[in-house]
Amino acid sequence: MATYGQPCARPMCIPPSYADLGKAARDIFNKGFGFGLVKLDVKTKSCSGVEFSTSGSSNTDTGKVTGTLETKYKWCEYGLTFTEKWNTDNTLGTEIAIEDQICQGLKLTFDTTFSPNTGKKSGKIKSSYKRECINLGCDVDFDFAGPAIHGSAVFGYEGWLAGYQMTFDSAKSKLTRNNFAVGYRTGDFQLHTNVNDGTEFGGSIYQKVCEDLDTSVNLAWTSGTNCTRFGIAAKYQLDPTASISAKVNNSSLIGVGYTQTLRPGVKLTLSALVDGKSINAGGHKLGLALELEA
């Protein structure tokens, strides 16, 4: 489940959103790795408070280069956030969010995208409401065939969490997504289980073994198949500026990552993916990422 602060002294606190259930375990598997990519991320902030984020990556297998540019401005007095996005597919995006103004805990977001090359447009209205013991979300994705409604709810009490997520496609007049999740968390241990559409079953465990070592286990199984997916991952903080990550799954894919803070605002990540079943056959992947922030 998600890391969202230490447990409350009171029996009630704000649970994470449905998308963030199990996030602590997923982060151990995903962060610190970038197989098959050479990536550069740059973040900076102007004197007027405008935040700029640029990202570029090159796929070492295909040679394809992709990039994104994002600008964000927060008008704190009115709880407004304006975001502009662009990517190398020439898709433009605009997002306007207002939070804690209509009522405490309510956030409304208006999100639009436009592709000049194809003329394709999309729009989405997103809302979330979080208070003690509850976190609700409802998004409406507009489409010419008919809007799709995405809803989610998470309830929490004394460390226990229960969540539900659905998608209703008005064009087909039926539910296209129907997910359930149950979990439990304490300060250094988190357990999460989920059922997606009644066919996919999954679970994850996050454990902070000590101050410098985090571990994670995940398991997934799809009904109607004999395929079970299993993985173990760990992250160890070597010192305040360096960490090493490792993971392995039941397909004998072994991933290793090393992250080093070269100086404040400059972070380098090196990673490698090795196929344990065919070590001498090649096909292994390397990754390099550099993050700059000022």
UniProtKB/Swiss-Prot annotation:
Keyword tRNA-binding part of the UniProt annotation? no
Q: What processing steps or modifications follow its translation?
A: Ubiquitinated by PRKN during mitophagy, leading to its degradation and enhancement of mitophagy. Deubiquitinated by USP30.
**Catalytic activity field:** chloride(in) = chloride(out); K(+)(in) = K(+)(out); a 1,2-diacyl-sn-glycero-3-phospho-L-serine(in) = a 1,2-diacyl-sn-glycero-3-phospho-L-serine(out); a 1,2-diacyl-sn-glycero-3-phosphocholine(in) = a 1,2-diacyl-sn-glycero-3-phosphocholine(out)
Alphabetically sorted, this entry's keywords are: Acetylation, ATP-binding, Ion transport, Isopeptide bond, Lipid transport, Lipid-binding, Membrane, Mitochondrion, Mitochondrion outer membrane, NAD, Nucleotide-binding, Phosphoprotein, Porin, Transmembrane, Transmembrane beta strand, Transport, Ubl conjugation
Where, in this chain's numbering, is NAD(+) bound? L253, I254, G255, S271, A272, L273, V274, D275
Localization, UniProt: Mitochondrion outer membrane; Membrane
Task: PTM Phosphothreonine: list the residues.
Answer: T118
Identify the residues that bind ATP.
K23, K31
Which residues, renumbered to this chain, carry the PTM N-acetylalanine?
A: A2
Q: Where are the transmembrane segments?
A: 37-46, 50-58, 65-75, 80-87, 91-100, 106-115, 122-131, 134-141, 148-156, 161-169, 174-186, 189-196, 200-209, 213-222, 229-238, 242-249, 253-262, 265-274, 284-293
Any single Pfam family the record assigns to this protein: Porin_3
Q: Which GO terms describe its molecular function?
A: ATP binding; ceramide binding; cholesterol binding; oxysterol binding; phosphatidylcholine binding; porin activity; voltage-gated monoatomic anion channel activity; voltage-gated monoatomic ion channel activity
Q: Which residues carry this modification: Phosphotyrosine?
A: Y78
Residues modified to N6-succinyllysine: K31
Q: Which residues carry this modification: N6-acetyllysine?
A: K31, K120, K277
Would I find Mitochondrion among this entry's keywords? Answer: yes
Q: Name one GO cellular component term.
A: sperm midpiece
- UniProt similarity note: Belongs to the eukaryotic mitochondrial porin family.
Quaternary structure (record): Monomer, homodimer and higher order oligomers; formation of higher order structures is necessary for scramblase activity. Interacts with ARMC12 in a TBC1D21-dependent manner. Interacts with KLC3. Interacts with SPATA33. Interacts with PPP3CC in a SPATA33-dependent manner.
Q: What does this protein do?
A: Non-selective voltage-gated ion channel that mediates the transport of anions and cations through the mitochondrion outer membrane and plasma membrane. The channel adopts an open conformation at zero mV and a closed conformation at both positive and negative potentials. There are two populations of channels; the main that functions in a lower open-state conductance with lower ion selectivity, that switch, in a voltage-dependent manner, from the open to a low-conducting 'closed' state and the other that has a normal ion selectivity in the typical high conductance, 'open' state. Catalyzes the scrambling of phospholipids across the outer mitochondrial membrane; the mechanism is unrelated to channel activity and is capable of translocating both anionic and zwitterionic phospholipids.
Any idea what this protein is called? Non-selective voltage-gated ion channel VDAC2
- Species annotation: Oryctolagus cuniculus
